[in-house]
């Protein structure tokens, strides 16, 4: 919620931020209406200063980075191929996974070659091929710290620099390729 005096907006109007469009908009708390353009009666000079201070891409990106990346945590995406010896041999793609560990390894090696050749990204491949429910988010696992993941996965992930992709990592869940995002 924004302060009317600081924003230069008429009474009952405030600046809000659209999550879907990632843009600021104007909301009238009395009438519950919103609009993309400032309402009539706005002190445009005050609004410009307010918008530059709180809604410029640089200040907003800095705030998001400070808020979103917790201390000591990293963000990764992964592509998981399960096999019949996996901890839970089922996924959103298959109710019962019957492939052997060797078949899973061969499959993941093929994916690894495609990613390394640049023909497809890990995220694009994860959308259709990963056995993890994170597939719908391009394999993005969000932020995690030490002790949050299986040790083998965690060790491989923390060894990566942002933008790097691991070799094949074997855990109780299955076989993974991991990409460090942040």
UniProtKB/Swiss-Prot annotation:
The keyword Oxidoreductase is annotated on this UniProt entry: no
Entry EC number(s)? 5.2.1.8
For this entry, list what GO says about its biological process.
regulation of macromolecule metabolic process; regulation of primary metabolic process
This chain's protein is named Peptidyl-prolyl cis-trans isomerase ssp-1
GO CC entries: cytosol; nucleus
Q: Which Gene Ontology molecular-function terms are recorded?
A: peptidyl-prolyl cis-trans isomerase activity
What does it catalyze?
Answer: [protein]-peptidylproline (omega=180) = [protein]-peptidylproline (omega=0)
């Amino acid at each position: 919620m924004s302060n009317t005096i600081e924003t230069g907006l008429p009474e009952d109007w405030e600046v809000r931020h659209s999550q879907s469009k990632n843009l600021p908009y104007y909301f009238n708390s009395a009438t519950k209406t919103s609009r993309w353009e400032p309402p009539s009666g706005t002190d445009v000079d005050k609004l410009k200063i307010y918008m530059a201070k709180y809604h410029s891409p640089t200040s907003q990106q800095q705030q998001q980075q400070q808020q979103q990346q917790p201390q000591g945590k990293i963000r990764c995406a992964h592509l998981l191929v399960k096999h019949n010896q996996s901890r839970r041999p089922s996924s959103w793609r298959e109710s019962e996974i019957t492939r052997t560990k060797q078949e899973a390894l061969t499959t993941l090696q093929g994916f690894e070659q495609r990613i390394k050749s640049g023909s497809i990204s890990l995220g694009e491949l994860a959308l259709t091929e990963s056995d993890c429910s994170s597939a719908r988010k391009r394999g993005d696992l969000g932020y995690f710290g030490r002790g949050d993941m299986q040790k083998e996965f965690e060790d491989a992930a923390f060894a990566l620099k942002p933008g790097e992709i691991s070799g094949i990592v074997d855990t109780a869940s299955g076989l993974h390729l991991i990409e460090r995002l942040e």
